[in-house]
Design a protein with these regions (language model features):
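Short glycine/proline-centered loop/turn elements that form peptide/ligand docking sites
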Residues: 105, 128-131, 148-153
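Conserved catalytic-core motifs of GNAT/GCN5-like acyltransferases
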Residues: 121-123, 136, 141-158
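Flexible nucleotide-binding loop
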Residues: 98
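Acetyl-CoA-dependent GNAT
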Residues: 3-6, 15-18, 22-94, 102-111, ...
Length: 178
């Protein structure tokens, strides 16, 4: 997904369209609110988000999902050809099950592929069946397990998706607003 790309997903009846586009620094207040609500024990700090955004577009790319102008999800990818790694993906509780996670993940897959990655890795808590189901439905396969990665009794599953050869000649995203 280049800086000029915007993905739109039609809304369910009575809802608002979902728009996925570049995460900007001015989105961070909403992102940090979501981060704290969704990951209270391991939330990224403002400094961690700023550090990640400072690496856009060289090796990182972050997107936000919006409904009605409000951030309802965000995701990021780290690309070092020939591999890429999902750094984070999060969807507001009220927006889960509405295709938001799928739209965010699709944007990361497109970005990784456009930058020449051949495989996309991620880790997911083993006790998150909805997330695991999403990843499997998009072709990710379990490669391994990290015991107690998220704390005692909370394992991480390591997953990967083989990417078809993409164009590494895709336009590089601009740094405006990073």
């Amino acid at each position: 997904m280049s800086s000029s790309s915007v993905a739109r997903q039609p809304a369910p009846a009575g809802g608002q369209d979902l728009v996925v586009d570049r995460l900007r620094w001015w989105d961070l207040d909403e992102v940090l609110d979501l981060e704290g609500a969704l990951f209270p024990e391991s939330a990224w700090t403002p400094g961690q988000f700023w550090s990640e955004l400072a690496r856009v577009p060289e090796s990182r790319w972050y997107v936000a999902a919006r409904r009605g102008g409000r951030v309802v999800g965000y995701a990021g990818v780290f690309v070092v050809v020939p591999e890429a790694d999902v750094q984070t993906i999060a969807v507001a509780t009220a927006d889960q099950g509405r295709g938001t996670g799928r739209a965010l993940l699709r944007a990361l897959v497109e970005c990784a592929q456009a930058r020449g990655a051949r495989v996309l890795h991620l880790e997911v808590r083993a006790d998150r069946p909805a997330a695991l189901g999403l990843y499997e439905s998009m072709g990710f396969e379990v490669d391994g397990r990290r015991r107690d990665y998220y704390g005692r009794g909370r394992d991480a599953l390591l997953m990967s998706l083989r990417l078809p050869s993409g164009s590494s000649d895709a336009p590089a995203p601009d740094r405006a607003g990073a």
